[in-house]
């Protein structure tokens, strides 16, 4: 048996301004920003993902607009397909008809699905196994707990958990939330963020706001 200390550590991951997409991922009709990453066996369809955002392995994201610095854990579902519960049948033979030799697919049904996009603001964290239903907006700085099912909009800097997801608490009190929105650090340049890395690491949110809030 080999001691753990004798095993070479993998080289540090290095991203770039070009999106990093795992070979096993499927990305179709998407726009990906700089320093973005798509993990193994993840599916992205008709989705925009802005700079620095990433999604880990085994996630499905469809019809979504994802802001900067969004953190999406594994096994997350964003905008899972809805079935026509109001029809005589819920089965997809009605809209994937070609697969069953029953004529052309129902393009209108897929347009209906597209009419409920998901919007995710900057600096959001979506935990392992969470589900975000169509038409939902998740605002800046929010946290979606692992295994949560989000069926309603989530306010800025709010932590939600459970099925259906409900607010647990705020990440910060309102003055800090407002200051963070004024600072909008997620819109800083790459060089500015790099220059201020020590403050991101060492300062509390309150101290960070005191230093960088233009109204402070």
List each model region and its residues.
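Flexible, glycine/small-residue-enriched loop-and-beta-strand segment within the central core
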Residues: 9-10, 14-32, 37-136, 163
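Conserved catalytic-core motifs of eukaryotic protein kinase domains, centered on the activation segment
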Residues: 82-84, 154, 170-172
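Leloir-type glycosyltransferase catalytic cores
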Residues: 111, 116, 184, 189-198
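Conserved catalytic segment of ABC-fold P-loop ATPases
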Residues: 139-140, 155-157
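A generic "structured core" feature
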Residues: 143-145, 149
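Conserved switch/coupling elements of ABC/ABC-like ATPase nucleotide-binding domains
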Residues: 164-168
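ABC ATPase nucleotide-binding domains
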Residues: 192-214
């Amino acid at each position: 048996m080999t001691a753990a200390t004798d095993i070479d550590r993998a080289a540090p991951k290095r991203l770039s301004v070009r999106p990093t997409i795992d070979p096993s991922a499927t990305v179709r009709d998407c726009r990906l920003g700089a320093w973005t990453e798509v993990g193994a066996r993840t599916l992205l369809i008709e989705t925009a993902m802005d700079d620095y955002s990433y999604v880990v392995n085994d996630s499905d994201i469809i019809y979504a607009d994802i802001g900067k610095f969004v953190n999406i854990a594994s096994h997350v579902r964003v905008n899972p397909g809805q079935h026509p519960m109001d029809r005589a049948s819920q089965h997809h033979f009605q809209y994937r008809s070609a697969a069953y030799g029953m004529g052309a697919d129902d393009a209108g049904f897929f347009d209906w699905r597209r009419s409920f996009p998901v919007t995710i603001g900057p600096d959001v964290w979506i935990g392992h196994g969470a589900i975000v239903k169509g038409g939902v907006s998740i605002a800046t700085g929010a946290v979606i707990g692992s295994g949560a099912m989000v069926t309603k909009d989530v306010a800025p800097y709010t932590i939600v958990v459970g099925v259906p997801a409900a607010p647990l608490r705020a990440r910060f009190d309102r003055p800090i939330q407002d200051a963070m929105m004024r600072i909008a650090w997620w819109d800083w340049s790459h060089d500015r963020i790099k220059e201020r890395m020590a403050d991101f690491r060492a300062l509390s949110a309150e101290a960070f706001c005191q230093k960088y809030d233009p109204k402070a």
